Amino acid sequence: MIEGLLGRKLGMTQIFDDEGRAIPVTVLEVGPCVVTQVKTSDRDGYQAVQLGFGHRKRQNRPMQGHLRASGASPRYLKEVRVDDATRFQVGQVIDCTIFQPGQLVDVIGWRKGRGFQGGVKRHGFAGGPKTHGQSDRHRAPGSIGPTTDPGRVHKGKRMAGRMGPVRVTVQNLRVERVDPQRNLVLVRGAVPGHPNGLVIVRYAVKQRRAKATA
């Protein structure tokens, strides 16, 4: 069994359930993914498959040789662990039908890069007073540490810095709809990243459990 696929984020919209309630969903184009390499325990020491997604017009010579057996020219490659690698063949296509409406998935994306930002935008600081003689401290972080002892700024202090495109995992998103004809998966809620950004959709690792009732 394969646990996840590559895809891209298309954007957000809303759908309506049977009772007419609006549900915010993110539309993901998941797959089709081509198996470009199969790794087995005998040869590689572990079992996994390498998946390719998207299309790249030109590949360099080493990549052309690597992809020749699969007949594909993907833009992205990702290795995914599997239980039994012998069930997969190079060139096999896997689509979004491995996901079903109602199940929970984890979506991995890369948050938008916003460059160097101050404490108000980066950490949600309140800033300084807007009145009482303040003129240049409206968005200042305030004090960043104690006095002579210890005489330094502690590690991990929240300060201004780069809000870079870091990897973010959103867990336990419910699959609302699956459209195999267009390779679309609609998940409830928001997903990190910009439109057309790469995402990884996998089965939920930490399944939510219902609270026990007395």
From Swiss-Prot:
GO terms for biological process: translation. The keyword Transport does not apply. One of its GO terms (molecular function) is structural constituent of ribosome. InterPro entries: Ribosomal_uL3, Ribosomal_uL3_bac/org-type, Transl_B-barrel_sf. Belongs to the universal ribosomal protein uL3 family. NCBIfam families: L3_bact (TIGR03625). This is Large ribosomal subunit protein uL3. It comes from Thermomicrobium roseum (strain ATCC 27502 / DSM 5159 / P-2). The gene is rplC.
